[in-house]
Design a protein with these regions (language model features):
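N-terminal nicking endonuclease/strand-transfer module with a His-rich metal-binding environment
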Residues: 1-157
Length: 157
């Protein structure tokens, strides 16, 4: 279902979620951005995404849009979070969209998918691993909220 499997830290009601498709938890905590007119119940992510699913009439409707953005590796995690929040707020939340995001920075791996150190040797020590690809996964609702907190028609942008 539309990328929700990337965010396995919450459970949806059993509408179409498949826990067997989740990925290893290699990301930071999932963060939530809501417009000010969003119902208070949407602060609970499972309520939000179940509401998104229940708002659709068609069984094969697109429920969300996922965007992946690269982040400067020179920034700290806190700075990457702040930068991502500002981008989401100004670009999506300002027009009524609800968003979740998680920041990943997976280690560089060898051909057997084992993390490696700066000399190319397998390493399980996070202090020796190489991290070069910080990025954010942003999941957006397809429908913006109106001023009363009700779903509007889907956004075509």
């Amino acid at each position: 279902m539309c990328g929700l499997r990337r965010f396995p830290s919450f459970k949806l009601f059993p509408l179409s979620y498949n826990p067997n498709t989740t990925r290893p938890k290699t990301h930071s905590a999932i963060r939530h951005n809501l417009p000010p007119n969003a119902p208070d119940t949407f602060k609970d992510r499972s309520v939000l995404w179940n509401g998104v699913e229940l708002a659709e009439k068609s069984g094969n409707a697109q429920l969300a849009r996922e965007i992946e953005i690269a982040l400067p590796k020179e920034l700290t995690l806190e700075q990457q979070i702040a930068l991502t929040r500002v981008y989401i707020q100004q670009t999506f939340v300002a027009v009524g969209m609800c968003a979740d995001f998680a920041i990943h920075n997976p280690p560089v791996t060898d051909s057997k998918h084992r993390p490696i150190d700066s000399e190319g040797n397998p390493s399980n020590d996070p202090d020796k691993m190489i991290f070069r690809n910080p990025h954010a996964h942003i999941m957006l609702t397809m429908r913006p909220l109106d001023k009363q907190g009700q779903w509007q028609p889907k956004s075509q942008k």
